[in-house]
């Protein structure tokens, strides 16, 4: 008997996450490690759990996550989007609720490129009147 699972991808900044949602007891594994071990910060763990708490599915699924690139905040945001997409694939009636909460929208903000002649993207040399 094949394992039925739902799949979702999420991206944020330079992070990418692949999410596999299976019926289970609420275990969340990121890159082979438990969620609490993978993310040191409590805020990152809260971000990951938001779609599940909103739809009251915290203890209904086992989630297997592969996250690459970026930092902790970017990966947490990518995972949140991926989980939301996987939940919609599982049950399309959850989509309006997740969209209203903003979990279905990809955060398009990226790092602005450094410009030639400037120190950073916008930081210029100090202006001297004389």
UniProtKB/Swiss-Prot annotation:
Domain of life assignment:
Bacteria
Q: Does the keyword Ion transport apply?
A: no
Q: Which GO cellular component terms are attached?
A: cytosolic small ribosomal subunit
User: Which key words tag this protein in UniProt?
Assistant: Ribonucleoprotein, Ribosomal protein
Q: Which residues form the signal peptide?
A: none
Q: Which Gene3D superfamilies match?
A: 3.30.230.10
The entry lists its GO molecular-function terms as:
RNA binding; structural constituent of ribosome
Q: Name one Pfam family in it.
A: Ribosomal_S9
One GO biological process from the UniProt record? translation
Q: Which family does it belong to?
A: Belongs to the universal ribosomal protein uS9 family.
Q: What is this protein called?
A: Small ribosomal subunit protein uS9
Q: Which organism is it from?
A: Xylella fastidiosa (strain 9a5c)
């Amino acid at each position: 008997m094949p394992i039925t699972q739902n799949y979702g991808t999420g991206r944020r900044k330079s992070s990418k996450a692949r999410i596999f949602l299976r019926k289970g007891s609420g275990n969340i594994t990121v890159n082979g490690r438990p969620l609490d071990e993978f993310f040191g910060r409590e805020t990152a763990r809260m971000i990951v759990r938001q779609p599940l708490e909103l739809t009251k599915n915290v203890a209904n699924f086992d989630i297997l996550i592969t996250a690459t690139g970026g930092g902790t905040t970017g990966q947490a945001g990518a995972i949140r989007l991926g989980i939301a997409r996987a939940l919609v694939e599982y049950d399309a009636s959850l989509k309006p609720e997740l969209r209203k909460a903003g979990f279905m929208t990809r955060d398009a903000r990226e790092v602005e490129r450094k410009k030639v002649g400037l120190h950073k993207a916008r930081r210029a040399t100090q202006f001297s009147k004389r």
